[in-house]
Amino acid sequence: MLGTYMTSDIEGRVNEVFQIVFDDLDLMVGRQTTAKDVEDWDSLTHINLIVAVEKEFKIRFTTAEVTNLKNVGELIDAILRKIG
Amino acid sequence: MEINLDYSRLLKEARAIRPAAGTPTLRIALLGDCALQQFLPLLRALFCRASFLAEIHEGGFDGTEFAALNPESALYRFEPDVIVLLNAVQCLRDKYYLRPGDASDFANETLSRMTRVWDSIRRHSSAQIIQSNFAAPIERIYGNYDLKVASSLPASVARLNLRISEEARSRSFVLVNDVEHLASWVGRKDWFDERFWTLAKSFCAPELLPLVAKNIVDIILSTRGRAVKCVILDLDNTLWGGIIGDDGPQGIQISAHGEGEEFHRLQCFLRELKNRGILLAVCSKNEHANAIAPFEQNPGMVLKLSDITVFVANWDNKAANIERIRQALNIGFDSMVFLDDNPFERNLVRDMLPEVIVPELPDDPSDYVKAISALNLFETSTRAAEDTQRTEFYRVEAQRQIAEATAASFEEFLQSLEMKIEVERFVPEQLSRIAQLLQRSNQFNLTTHRYTHAHCEAMMNDTEYCLPLSASLSDRFGDHGLIAIVVARPDVVAGSLEITDWLMSCRVLTRGVEEYLMNRIVEEAHRRGLGRVRGEFIPTSKNGMVKDFFARFGFEKAREDADGRTEWALETAAYTPRHVFLQRVGDISSIGA
């Protein structure tokens, strides 16, 4: 289950990053989405995802943030903290 | 020319790879003490751009020694063409920190473990080894004084890099992947991303992994026929500052100090390339007399007329002139680089001759060499004594063409050349040149097997089952050097001599060399009591000129595959030796087993 679909600008941009990283233009992620919900979301693509998010928002996560993100919602919160 | 090395773009390209039937395959084993998986899509995508299909074996994490030292390992079962060894300085740093004693022997011990891996691979495989060196570490314990402390980490890494180069020089089967160059080029504070080392053992910052992959691919492609053989130069505001037609030979800017120093530096760089064996040609919109004047009259010029193999100055369009240069040199468009300050000319050549490599040059001539260097256009995997003579070979060839034009008949011309040919089994002194010809020849090449130096050595030593021959040609104008390779294998059971490889330098076509060699091959089959000679043709995108090679000599087509491969057979009794104007040097028995 993907939970609530994203609507805000940030959430939309995050979703686009997911679509590019996982090469799936139909992919829709929500705050509750975890790695288990997305095909090919493994430790390698996780790094690709972090690199792509950092580039999109011109931010830099700490090692702990990269490790501890539990779902897309936490990713969005982390982005908001950095650009806010 | 733009090389897109965007990380996510390459990942996307890798997902979209759909190889066409018949795409040549490269078997690459990747071993290292860092995350290797990340490299797979990048290597696949870059090889796909070069029209190769990469089959990649991924070694276990930090499993290089285990795989290399065990003859039964999955590495050797994979039968790789190339073994890529990646060693991260981050991993070296861990070992340095956790060393049991003092660090005075750290570099030497690390090096001997590396050379042991190389030499073990050499015993169990003919694969080419590509060994990375180390990015200089970012840690400083003593500050600048680190370099005065031989056992410090920075001093150890510097020494290790030097020793890797030295040990590789004495082993033709080891090529160096200069990671330190890449890291310095980018800047080490950006190169290292310690987060991703901690989390995933990423070799460097992930966005920079494509640079490492490109370096590896450049090296491998240089062992597979990709080579820049000629640099074509514009003159005004490319090779010197100013316009020769307006400023005159003394008015242009070209001098070692002061005005035109940046052009002087470019010319020095080009002269180094020429000394290395890369041909220089001029393609300029000018009156010919004006264009050559600075070469003859301006003492500031580094390049002399004798450094230029083909000089074309006229008012025709540059694409037509580059085609003339290509014909004169008999090389492929994809082995030519065109340098011109004028964006109009660059775009015209890109449009009309898309295979020619046309680097984008910056507005400021001071940055030309940097822009050219960034592209790594001149990668090579071999170096032979003949390289330095290459410009001379072509210059002498021009004299032959004049002789040909003035001779009463082609036969008379061939006779007047007084050609001498020496055919012999591969010998150790020639192996570098032999491996180079095998790696560079694309057009006159019947099967395009890209043997490594190690393969050539194995064939040389296999006196029972392999007849690996090289031919060297000279004539009254000068020496051509080693210009042809034929590998044949006697099959006593089938009663035939099998030609597995036949390739020649395009410098010596239509001289009768191939006729002479075929005479010798048939003679050799006779001598061994073999009643038949068989051969194979494997088509590539470049060797169309030899599609009918065997038919020319009266071979019958025995087989044709859907992919265009053909097999041919000739009854030796039915062969009439071809008339040639070549005089044999050396003894016939020199090639026999």
Task: List each language-model region with its residue ranges.
Chain B
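Alpha-helical cap/lid subdomain in secreted, periplasmic
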Residues: R18-T25, L42, A50-G59, T64-E207, ...
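Serine-esterase "nucleophile elbow" of acetyl-processing enzymes
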Residues: M1-G59
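Conserved Lys-Pro-Asp/Glu-containing loop-to-beta segment of HAD-superfamily phosphomonoesterases
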Residues: I322-P343, V349
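Alpha-helical substrate-recognition element adjacent to the catalytic core
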Residues: C230-I232, D236-A320, E379-L431, A435-Q439, ...
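Acyl-donor binding region in acyl/amide transferases
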Residues: R476, L482-D561
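Short hydrophobic segments within beta-strands
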Residues: A29-L31, S132, D234, C283, ...
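Terminal substrate-recognition subdomain of acyl/acetyltransferases
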Residues: A328, R350, P354-L417, E523-A593
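A short helix->loop->beta-strand "cap" motif at the edges of active sites that frequently abuts
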Residues: R122-Q128, G277-I278, E355-V356
